[in-house]
């Protein structure tokens, strides 16, 4: 549906393959250039600090009046959307500049021309043809930590605006202190509704946030120039960006500590926040409009005893089919005990052959850096 909505003929769309990790492309009829990551919680962090990035101390966004003067959640969310739109625009300027070198490397274009359909006959790569063929594919923007933002917005909405248990000033002080001395406020934030549990209060925020991201991306073409490809979309291959992205983000209103890993993928709950079982998790993920995304990614960690029998395998198959029927695009599993992962961290020489799914790719667990290992360990372990 995503491909045909972009003008790709149905016969080509049905012949798609996966470029990179989870992004669809048409073999022999599409060029591919990896997209960039967009760390969504950074926008919320800057907004909560009245336009200043506390990581650098620099003013990154002009926002007035002070965030503490906002009286309704609707006003707060509108301010967040305005900031998000601003930073997405800056992100596209960066994307444009980072893509410019490709325009000057003839060897790249020659290779691309030779490998695509009708390339030798036409004598031009896809990006140089006018009009650019609808099959020309450029990787989408990958929003990192959007689920952390949904959880954070739900906490702000409930505690500051709906129930008025907390002032914005008190929340900002707790975040600035990385919760030290404000453990009671962190406890309140952790108890707020969390995505992944089939709770409308927070799932509706996640859905609305992704809808906004999708609509904003639809305003841009690859590198900001219509002649260089189709309109961009949202991608799901977070790879290990949740670790690097989290390293530059302070504490967030979802109860997360500064510098810790963000939620992986694009549809996965934040680590350990889904407590109502796999069915509730899938229902939350299915509320996101995945048909408008180039790709999405949902990671699930299963306890090995969940797949002990043939009947258990049938249950897993039914779970996957149900998710697809609800509109889910991509779901993947790690079948491993938390105990085994912790053991592998202590004695890596004993687990050289232990393979796990990280994002859209598999890797030897002991070869991953400690931060990414910890992310896999902390994912909720469920049974079916």
Model-derived features: positions:
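Conserved catalytic cores of very large enzyme subunits
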Residues: 1-384
């Amino acid at each position: 549906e995503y491909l045909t909505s972009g003008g790709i003929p149905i016969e080509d769309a049905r012949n798609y393959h996966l470029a990179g990790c989870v992004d669809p492309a048409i073999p022999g009829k599409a060029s591919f250039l990896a997209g960039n990551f967009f760390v969504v919680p950074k926008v919320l962090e800057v907004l909560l600090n009245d336009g200043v990035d506390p990581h650098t101390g620099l003013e990154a966004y002009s926002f007035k009046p002070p965030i503490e003067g906002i009286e309704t959640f609707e006003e707060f969310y509108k301010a967040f959307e305005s900031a998000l739109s601003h930073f997405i625009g800056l992100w596209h300027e960066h994307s444009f500049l980072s893509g410019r070198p490709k325009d000057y490397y003839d060897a790249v274009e020659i290779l691309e021309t030779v490998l695509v359909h009708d390339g030798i006959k036409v004598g031009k790569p896809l990006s140089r043809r006018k009009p650019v063929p609808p099959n020309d594919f450029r990787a989408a923007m990958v929003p990192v930590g959007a689920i952390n933002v949904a959880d954070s917005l739900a906490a702000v909405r409930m505690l500051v605006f709906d129930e008025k248990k907390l002032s914005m000033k008190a929340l900002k002080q707790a975040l600035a202190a990385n919760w030290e001395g404000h453990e009671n406020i962190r406890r309140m934030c952790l108890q707020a509704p969390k995505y992944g549990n089939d709770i409308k209060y927070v799932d509706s925020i996640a859905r609305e946030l992704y809808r906004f991201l999708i609509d904003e991306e639809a305003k841009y073409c690859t590198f900001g120039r219509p002649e260089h490809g189709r309109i961009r979309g949202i991608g799901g291959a977070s790879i290990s960006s949740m670790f690097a992205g989290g390293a530059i983000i302070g504490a967030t209103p979802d109860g997360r500590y500064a510098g810790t890993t963000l939620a992986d993928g694009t549809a996965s709950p934040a680590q350990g926040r889904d407590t109502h079982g796999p069915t509730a998790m899938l229902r939350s993920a299915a509320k996101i409009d995945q048909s408008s995304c180039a790709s999405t990614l949902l990671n699930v960690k299963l306890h090995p005893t969940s797949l002990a029998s043939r009947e258990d395998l049938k249950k897993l198959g039914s779970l996957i089919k149900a998710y697809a029927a609800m509109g889910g695009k991509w779901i993947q599993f790690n079948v491993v005990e938390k105990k085994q992962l912790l053991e592998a961290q202590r004695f890596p020489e004993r687990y050289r052959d232990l393979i796990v799914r990280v994002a859209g790719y598999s890797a030897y667990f002991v070869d991953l850096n400690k931060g990414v290992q910890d992310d896999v360990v902390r994912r909720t372990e469920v049974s079916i």
